[in-house]
Structures are given as C-alpha cells and as structure tokens.
Amino acid sequence: MVEALILGWNPEYEPLKGWILNAAVTTKIFIDIFIGVWAFILAVVWVYWIERRPGEKVEKVEIWYRFPKFVIGYFLTFVIVAWLTSAAINAYAASLGVSVSELTTEQFKAAYAPFSAAVNEMNSLRRIFFALTFFSIGVISDFSVLRKEGLGRLALVYFVCLFGFIIWIGLAISYLFFHDVHLLFLK
C-alpha cells in the first residue's frame, strides 16, 4: 500500500517497483539481529545475576540454551543471500564488460531477474508456513494459564512499547539505511 502511494505521488519511481519491500525485508533482518544481540545480553544477565544462587557455578552452555537460535538463521540467511546476489550481479556486469556501478536500471533488473523469479515461486510457500506458524502457536497455547498469570497486562505493555517505541526505531533505521537508495537506481 505504501509503495502504491509513493508511486502514485512520484510516477518517476515506477522503475523501482518492489524496492520498498526489499528495504522493509532488509530492515526487518537488521532489527531481528538487533533483538538477538539484546536477547544474548539478557540471557547472560539472567543466568549470571538474576537466577544464579549463591555459590552456584553457572555453565556457559546455559547461555546457549537460552539464546534464540532464529537470530543465527536470520544472520546466515542475510549473509548468504547478499553474497549470492552480489556475485550474480557482478558476474552479469562482467559478462557485459562493465562495472556494477555502470549498469543501467534495465541491466540491473535483468541481473536480478533470477532472484525475483525465485522469490515469486517461494511466495506461496511463505504464506503457507506463515499461516502454519500462527496456527501452531494457537494450538499449543493454553490461554487460561496466561490469563491466570496476568499476562494480559504484559500484552498491553508490549502493545504500548510496540507503537510507542519499536515502530519508531524501525522507521529511524529504515530512514538511515534507505532514504536515498532510490537515487542509486534512477540514473
């Protein structure tokens, strides 16, 4: 929807259709890695200072058990996809006898076309797995226990933090990384 509004106000950006999604995905990966760093810090603090009993020796593997492993997946996925994309675009530019910075928008799109095709093929699987994820969470959740523990207030705090803090950080990160990206592609 945002992309449609931007393209409606700025028709000259039409060649960049899809860049907002790419920027959003990259920002999401950065934010998830940032969350992973804080999750690691919290795991260390929790293991060594909050749950540690006097005289008890804490094993370092306990931090590994508490660390959210999905962060490693995000990081590796980001690095692998960035490397593959860069290698493919560099190879395409080399086959034309030019540097990547000399590629026109059409040539850049042609170099990126195999990745766009792969993403289009994976979109149906992405939707299915996304639905299965939330279905699974709903199936295994015992909401009566959550209600009894008073986690409704925690959900309210999360909601307030999300809209009062987290979204603004995401917007700031997006702006810092992507505010002039369209200028790179509109030659």
Curated annotation (Swiss-Prot):
InterPro entries hit by this protein: UPF0324_pro (IPR018383)
Superkingdom of source? Archaea
The intrachain disulfides are none
Q: What is its main location?
A: membrane
Question: Which chain regions cross the lipid bilayer?
Answer: 29-50, 70-92, 128-147, 154-176
Keywords for this protein: Cell membrane, Membrane, Transmembrane, Transmembrane helix
Give yes or no: UniProt keyword Cell membrane. yes
Task: Return the GO cellular component terms, semicolon-separated.
Answer: plasma membrane
Is Transmembrane helix among the key words of this record? yes
Q: List where in the cell it is found.
A: Cell membrane
* Membrane topology, as annotated: Multi-pass membrane protein
PANTHER family in the cross-refs? INNER MEMBRANE PROTEIN YEIH-RELATED, UPF0324 MEMBRANE PROTEIN FN0533
Stated name of the protein? Uncharacterized protein AF_1618
